[in-house]
Structures are given as structure tokens and as C-alpha cells.
Amino acid sequence: MEQCYNRGCGQLFDPQTNNDESCRHHPGEPFFHDAYKGWSCCNKKSVDFTEFLNIKGCTLAKHSNVKPPEPEKPVKDESDKDEVIEVRAPIREALPRPPIDSPLTVIQPTVAPALKDMVFAVKTPAAQKSSDAIEVGTTCKNNGCTYSFTGNSSDFGECTYHPGVPIFHEGMKFWSCCQKRTSDFSQFMAQKGCTYGEHKWVKENDDKKVVQCRYDWHQTATNVVMAIYAKKYDYSQSVIELNPIRLHVNLVFPEQDNARFDLDLELRGIVNVSNASAHMYGTKVEIKLPKLEPGSWSNLNFPNKKLPVVKKSQVEEKKKQEESDEEFFDLDDIKAETSFRLSEMSMQSPNNLD
């Protein structure tokens, strides 16, 4: 008796009685996939190994005492064993750089309460100190205000005035800051101001002093954060302007005769202006510049570059364009028929005017 080596048979057979229908076996290969066990020659499969071994063969043939050849194992190629595969990140195409003279957008900062208290404490003594040099009867320099200096505490009260300029056009007289128009000069002069603020007893000096402030910056994956270290600056007069590649900061220091710190930078990268923000604290100004494209900045700005003159914001440009055809006048240069200056015109009780 000889052993049959056909897959799925495993019986002993007599070579003398061996014929074409003696052996029921599986001519295919066994396979194991996803917990299933089966044969490649038929569709029978099972998850149980015992059931898999008991699956009857699907083909009849003679018994064979020859072992079937083992399936060839794939030859392991070790020729690339020491090869180093370098994976590089895909190169992103850089965004086009906007023009440096693109319109600047004014960033409205969040002001800390401590800074507001500090500025108020600085401005109040300065106003009281300047009152010693103001003569009684001096008219407020704000347009539209007829209040005269009396030397009392009420001189530092609320002022109602026009921040704009007078315009005379096609027989109409009005202020650039509001929409009220009239053809009568007396009504124009008596028109109540549209803005509330403080009285101005002395004209501002155009010769501004310069202050040097230290600034620094750091960056994250999505933002560049800049800090300007300054104290006792007036948040209401200071300006932060930005376009995609340019930052302009102007800080005013009332305690130093309105000296200014002016910083104008061409930024190294491109920023998202709409998401930019600023915070004003008692010891610094912090500006957050969101990156418009991923990547690290090698520096904050391009040093030693001469930048074009700062443009006004789009709103100011539009307003300027609308008023470009109008005629502007300085009220101090206009004389009435009675030969007295309009800025000095007052009634018997000027402080009682509405």
C-alpha cells in the first residue's frame, strides 16, 4: 500500500487497483483570506479550520504517491537594502506680491482700560497747566465754537464744533463734516457743531518731535505678532494702518508736546488684512498679522527700503475726491462788511449761544 499525496485525499492505495476515479481531491491551492479558509479550485470555504479540512475534493483522478511541488516563495531583493528614500514636501507656488502702494486699511484697536486712565491723567494736568498762558476772552480755535475763555473750570468742559472745513460752492455754504447746507451766511455761522470734544485754546504746532520706541516680533504657524513698547501714548490720536505687505504705525505722546513715533515697514510676507487685529496696553501696542500663505518668515520686513508716501484710506480718498471741486476757505481770512475777523465774531454773550 502506498500513501496518496493529492490534496484533500491522504488515503492509502493499491497501485494495482488505482484508476481514474479512485481519488477525490482538490487540484488547486489552499488559501486563507479575511478569516476564511478555502480552495482555489472550488467555491467552498469556511471560517472553521476543521470544516475546511473536511471539505470533500472537487475532482476525481488517480491516486498519486508523488508530493505536489511547494509554491514558490518570492525572492527577497536586498539590492536596495541600504538605499535612502528622500521624501520632499510638494513645492507650493508663491502668491503674487501686491503693490507696495496699495490702499491702507485702518485697524481699529482694542484699548485697555488702564491705558485710558493713564492718558486721561496725562492730558488733564497738561490742559490745566496751559490755562495760565491763555488770556481771558480768547476764542476757542475749533471751527463753529464761539465759546470764549473765562478762566473758570468750565473752560475745560465739552466743546461742540465742526472738525471739517467750511465750503462755499454754487451759492451754498456748509461744513465738510456734515450735510446741513444754507445760502445765508448768518445761518451758516450760527450752525451748531456736529462733534463733541475739548476746547482748543492754542493752535497746534506743526513742528512735531520724534520719539524712538523699541519693537520686537515673533511668529507662529499662522500669525506674525509684533509688539511696540511705549508708555503714555494717546490711543485716540494714534493710527495703525495696514495693507497686504505694508504696516504703518503712528503713535502720539501728548506729555512730550505731541511728539510722534512713526514706523513704516514693507513686510517680508503677505498678510490677511481682514483678519488682522491690534491691542493697545499701558506699556505696549500688540499687532497680530495673520499669514495669507503658509511658511516661516525669515525676517519681519525688508530693511533699508525707501517706501512711497502713505496713502489715505479708501474712505478718506473718496471723501477727498468728492470735495476736490469745492472751494475751501479759512474763516480767519474772510472779512465781513463791518471789517472784523469772522473767528473773532461774537455777540454780547457768546457763551450762551446754542
Swiss-Prot record:
A single GO cellular-component term on record: cytoplasm
Q: Return any one Pfam family short name.
A: CS
The residues covered by the CHORD domain are: 4-63, 140-199
In which broad location class does this protein mainly occur, judging by the first location in its UniProt entry?
A: cytoplasm
Identify the residues that bind Zn(2+) 3. C140, C145, C159, H199
What quaternary structure, including any partners, is listed in this protein's UniProt entry? Answer: Interacts with Hsp83.
Listed name of the protein: Cysteine and histidine-rich domain-containing protein morgana
Instruction: Please spell out the taxonomic lineage of the organism that makes this protein.
Output: Eukaryota, Metazoa, Ecdysozoa, Arthropoda, Hexapoda
